[in-house]
Swiss-Prot record:
The gene is HOATZ. This is Cilia- and flagella-associated protein HOATZ. Residues 142-151 have a biased composition (Basic residues). It comes from the Eukaryota. Keywords: Cell projection, Cytoplasm.
Length: 168
């Protein structure tokens, strides 16, 4: 069984760092299935390709300059306090609007349910009335003639019947 991952990692040391051997254990599986599973999990780790990693030269700096702390700490407190108050107020407002929207939706669905029940009751009433009318008019309806379909017997069936009669 091969313990080295796919060629996306450049060296065996990197594969050991990415997945120590104790973590990838597939007991009860065939070697082929274990290898495929290991390749999948190593490929799914989403490490960047070596070509896409940033390389810093000695003269380049890719970091932004660090902000220096301000000398007075009192303005910071007044700056941050309104932010927290506004945030809590906005949370309250959003919570209230959510409650209002939920109550409106609930009212809307209750109205729909009430209308649905009314429609179902109306349909039941109409059905009962229709059944009563049919029962009242049933004795007065003319009785239809029962048409007996003529049996069409094919020649092969006739021959079969004649053969059966001949056997008796």
């Amino acid at each position: 069984m091969e313990t080295r991952p796919s060629s996306s990692l450049s060296s065996p040391e990197e594969s050991c760092e990415a997945f120590p051997q104790g973590l990838l254990v597939f007991t009860g599986s065939s070697d082929r299935d274990a290898n495929l599973a290991k390749q999948f999990w190593i490929g799914a780790s989403m490490y960047p390709h070596n070509e896409s990693q940033l390389v810093l030269s000695r003269g380049s700096s890719q970091r932004l300059p660090v902000a220096r702390p301000s000398r007075s700490s009192a303005p910071e407190k007044t700056y941050f306090q309104p932010f927290f108050l506004e945030e809590s107020k906005s949370r309250d407002v959003t919570a209230e609007t959510l409650k209002i929207q939920e109550s409106e939706e609930k009212k809307k669905y209750l109205q729909k349910a009430k209308k649905r029940d009314e429609i179902i009751q109306l349909l039941r009433k109409q059905r009962e009335e229709r059944i009563l009318k049919e029962l009242i008019s049933l004795p007065h309806k003319p009785k239809g003639k029962v048409h007996k379909a003529k049996k069409v017997i094919s020649e092969s069936d006739k021959e079969d019947q004649e053969e059966v009669k001949a056997l008796d």
